[in-house]
Amino acid sequence: MKKIAAVLSVLALLCACVPAMAEETYEPLYTLAAPYGFKMGAPLSFDQLRNQKYLNLVKAHFNSITTTNEMKAYSLLNLQATKARTDGMPGMNYSAADQMVQWAQDNGIGVRGHVLVWDAYMTDWFFREDYDSKKPYADQETIKARTESYITEVVTHFEEKFPGVVYCWDVVNEAVGDSDSEYAAGDARHLRTLRSGSPNLFREYMGEDYVALAFLYAKNAVEALGADTKLYYNDYNAYFSDKAQAIRALIDSVNTFAQDENGNNRQLCDGVGMQGYIGGYGVQEGCLVDSHVGMIRDEILNYAAMGLEVQITEMAVRNFDLTQADKRAAFYAKLFQMFMELNGENGNPLKAVSIWGLTDTNAPKGNYVYNLNSPYGGLFDLKLNIKDAFVKVYETLKQ
């Protein structure tokens, strides 16, 4: 009996040392967030559809997903399908994206459509005559027609195949430049002309109104479908005042661009996606700074004052120093406390919080993912066990 008791004691001790699995031990985060008016979102890649442990975690705690790359134009556009068409419009391959949205639908999870128009990594052949990279760039009207066709067909495809699942679209991503070398002098919108020295092909060949036109095409598609799909502008550093001011100027230009039959401005843009990478890029300096919480709050309210919804779309609370784990957990608690109080006091302008840095990363130092999300930036570790930051978020929402 003594041996059995000793064995049982050891087993109990071992069990106590095993980290708790979030989906087994805790109420869903999205259930706790619902009374405060916002969804809880997670990223999903096509490869993760084969990771059942990750899928279980997402199902347990999140009621919104964002496909990381698979709904972007460079993923959907297909040259073979394009050249097979007889109308001269672009063709798409929805295979990977459809599987991901199907999974979301099967599990009662909404999808943020990300993204219809983004200059980064955009396929060059989309802008060329006859879609041939060896030929000159096509004229402006051709690019407008292609973009309208692309946006209309993509929005229509997902709404008709998965009604109501894609509840919002990032129509345009990161169109605001960061430095005066990236936008024209005197442009209050800071509309991006260059990205890392390369021209913004949408602005170059579609024109300075390409953002407003993209929203117009998307709004027309949504209204034709009779869908309740919200249309967002999405950008990083959207809580820094200078960039936020330019974003507001851009959205104001979008929402005064087109008029209805009565001459009233059509609100083409419904909301702002604040990506939410918080802290230094690749370095600990600038991470876990309490003043950032107030800055985020202030800009959410500034966007809301324009009649816009807000979502935190790609949040990563960066941490490059493992010894700062407790401080980071406390920072996460302050952040969610602010979200809850802000919505309670201001009519729920914040509609979703999507966490991009969901897990830690083992990407090598200096790697893009290392810099973007940080090695210790997750709510969960590399094995998907909960971290103190998750517990703090949970306790804050549950109070």
Spans of features found by a protein language model:
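Glycoside hydrolase catalytic-domain groove-lining segments
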Residues: 94-95, 106, 204-234, 239-323, ...
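Bacterial N-terminal signal peptides
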Residues: 8-16
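Positively charged n-region of N-terminal signal peptides that target proteins for export
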Residues: 1-8
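N-terminal structural segment of carbohydrate-active enzymes
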Residues: 25-70, 82
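Aromatic-rich peripheral "rim/lid" segments of glycoside hydrolase catalytic domains that contact
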Residues: 26-28, 77, 143, 157-164, ...
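Sec-dependent signal peptide cleavage junction
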Residues: 17-24
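Substrate-binding cleft and catalytic face of glycoside hydrolase catalytic domains
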Residues: 30, 60-81, 86-238, 308, ...
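Short, electropositive alpha-helical surface patch
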Residues: 124-143, 148, 238-255, 326-341, ...
